[in-house]
């Protein structure tokens, strides 16, 4: 899979931009605060209908305007797709091949992406919500039903929490009805996550073993707030533990267990990776990203698009080499950087773009078809 071109209208500091890409490597070079990250964010947004930097769509709109449009042509093994996202004060419209998509789960997955940004280094030591977001984005791209089930779970969770916060005399019968619905959707969310982590663990360990020059093994554990013995019993245990938590939940006025409380833990040679060195943690995240690429390829039969936002300078030559070896010619890759000096072992087939104050121009001397 690769994105052939993109058109931006009123996106961040871009009033208008149209760019044709190389199917291999695309490098965006320029000083800080010129729009390099904004451009990669636009590709990410076109794929996932969300930014990795902000929850507010208003921040994506050029200061002179009130609407945004991003369009792109994607080439897949199954054919060409035209993607279109429009944001306005009236709301959001997503289209695939000019047809409106009623549900988020109908749109996401048309173009798959893997993002590697500086904030990803917080996946090891950061808040559990970062790791849950990582799971939700990855699983959502390869299993559309996951997004629907997660959305339903969050809807019932919000109902349950609102009821607990606003009701002085809780009706246990009504609470049990909400428990049933929460356990239905939540158990499926946990099952999807559990399966994904098992597959990710196997693939990431292979990459980490190579990157660490065969010195380290990586393992990833799903840490559920629900105690269960096997996948078939998740719903039963979830429902039972929800019932047991009624008194606590009524007192605290929120739902204390469920996938919204879950986490993942990383181990290097059986030692919690929060105690690992910065170099080891960088290798871990790099291994995760390479594993994401392979898992998406396995499920969808198409390689995802790789977005490397200002991370090459964070990697030494050894890790850069392993990253570029891992993607080879199969993965269309976008790199932002302030200088080419940080980059090593670049392939012959690439395009280099200059970015300056919301304007993109091709570097003719260094671009190849």
Swiss-Prot record:
Any one GO CC term of the record: cytoplasm
Name one molecular function that GO assigns to this entry: single-stranded DNA binding
Q: Where is the protein found, in the record's own terms? A: Cytoplasm
CDD domains xrefs:
ABC_RecF
Example of a GO biological process term = double-strand break repair
Q: Where does ATP bind?
A: 30-37
Q: What Pfam families does this protein map onto?
A: SMC_N (PF02463)
Swiss-Prot/TrEMBL keywords: ATP-binding, Cytoplasm, DNA damage, DNA repair, DNA replication, DNA-binding, Nucleotide-binding, SOS response
Q: Which domain of life is it from?
A: Bacteria
Q: Is Nucleotide-binding given among the entry's keywords?
A: yes
What function does this protein fulfil? Answer: The RecF protein is involved in DNA metabolism; it is required for DNA replication and normal SOS inducibility. RecF binds preferentially to single-stranded, linear DNA. It also seems to bind ATP.
Family per record: Belongs to the RecF family.
Question: This protein is called what?
Answer: DNA replication and repair protein RecF
């Amino acid at each position: 899979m690769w994105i052939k071109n993109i058109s931006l209208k009123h996106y961040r500091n871009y009033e208008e931009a149209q760019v044709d890409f190389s199917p291999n490597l695309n490098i965006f070079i320029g000083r800080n605060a010129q729009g390099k990250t904004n451009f990669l964010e636009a590709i990410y947004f076109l794929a996932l209908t969300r930014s990795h930097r902000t929850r507010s769509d208003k921040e994506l709109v050029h200061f002179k305007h009130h609407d945004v449009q991003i369009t792109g042509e994607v080439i897949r093994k199954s054919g060409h797709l035209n993607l279109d996202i429009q944001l306005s004060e009236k709301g959001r419209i997503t289209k695939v091949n000019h047809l409106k998509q009623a549900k988020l789960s109908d749109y996401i997955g048309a173009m798959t992406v893997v993002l590697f940004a500086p904030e990803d280094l917080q996946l090891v030591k950061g808040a559990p919500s970062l790791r849950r977001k990582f799971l939700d984005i990855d699983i959502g791209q390869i299993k559309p039903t996951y997004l629907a089930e997660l959305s339903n779970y969050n809807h019932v969770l919000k109902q349950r929490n609102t009821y607990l916060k606003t009701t002085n005399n809780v009706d246990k019968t009504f609470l049990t009805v909400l428990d049933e619905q929460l356990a239905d959707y939540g158990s499926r969310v946990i099952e999807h996550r559990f399966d994904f982590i098992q597959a990710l663990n196997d693939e990431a360990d292979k990459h980490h073993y190579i990157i660490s020059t065969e010195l380290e093994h990586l393992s990833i554990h799903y840490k559920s707030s629900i105690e269960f013995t096997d996948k078939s019993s998740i719903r039963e245990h979830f429902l039972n533990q929800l019932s047991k938590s009624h008194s606590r939940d009524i007192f605290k006025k929120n739902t204390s267990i469920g996938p919204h409380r879950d986490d993942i833990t990383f181990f290097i040679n059986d030692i919690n990776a929060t105690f690992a060195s910065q170099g080891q943690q960088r290798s871990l995240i790099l291994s995760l990203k390479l594993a994401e690429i392979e898992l998406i390829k396995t499920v969808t039969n198409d390689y995802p698009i790789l977005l490397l936002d200002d991370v090459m300078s964070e990697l030494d030559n050894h890790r850069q080499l392993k990253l570029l070896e891992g993607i080879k010619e199969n993965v269309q890759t976008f790199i932002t950087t302030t200088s080419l000096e940080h980059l090593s072992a670049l392939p012959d087939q690439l395009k280099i773009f200059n970015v300056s104050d919301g304007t993109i121009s091709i570097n003719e001397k260094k671009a190849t078809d």
